[in-house]
Amino acid sequence: LRTLPARVYHLAEAANWPSIRRSGLLSTTALLDQAGVQGNKRERIERSQRLQHLVLPNGVQVRDQKPLPARALAACLVGMLPSEWYGLINSQVFFWLDMDRLNRQRLACGSRPQVVLVIDVERLVARYGERMALSRINSGNARRRPARRGRCTFVPYREWVNSGWSSETEGLGLCLRERSHPPAELTVAGDATDIMNCVTDIHRLSPGELLRSP
């Protein structure tokens, strides 16, 4: 735990707050399961670029993926198709490790109110360590000279603790990175249904408001 910050952050749509309190944090894949979305509609949402912010049949909202055009992904993916990358990131719950990245995402959400969950990392690891992974890049952005990426981008937490980014650099053919290179994202595969037991603080952000240091 000494190699991770004491807390991480999750930015959620304020409209989804009742669902989060009931069911915890769910990946897009899990949200589609919960809402009963199937067939071609599900395929479009889960395995292609979402150009619009969506409201599912149960009222839960799913954000667009405008920074992830398929053509840009095709140029930077290793051993994967764009549809597979969309499926991979839609199967995970994402956390930011610093407020600057969170605030950049918040700006991309425009005027929609947001809720920030501040998460205790020690509690998160205790509950979800076996399903946690770390990424050194913003996996949801492929604009402006996108970084090479693939399945190895998400390094399992236990592996990262022991050997840093070595599996990513080997798997993607990258230059070896220092073990101290900070992660950009922390992910939990599938869902984090009891995330409220890991929450230390909650911030409600009105339209245009950013998260500030305490």
Predicted ranges, named:
Residues L1-A6, P18, G36-V93, L97-P214:
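Conserved NAD+-utilizing ADP-ribose enzyme module
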